[in-house]
């Protein structure tokens, strides 16, 4: 009896380990990308990239782009948000905050018919008008 249990465990253990590894893997390419309501997403980004006058006074006029990378997990939650570049003036942190404060729900990415963690990238553009 002990031999049967031991043999069963030896057979099942590799599959359990592979499944655990798959759940932790973050996909870069997927069959279906994670998505959210585009109208709500665009409105959120537009609203959150409006800089207050106190910040505009401290930054030279111009257009500043911050590329943000984040992960949408299998439940549609956003995490691991980071700026891939920093134009300075605290704009990278502001861009990360744009993503982290979004309250809309994400649909996770899909690979082989199941939800998976996947990277997303979003450019955040700040426009500072000439004074």
Predicted features along the sequence, with ranges:
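Repetitive helical segments and hydrophobic/amphipathic motifs
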Residues: 11-12
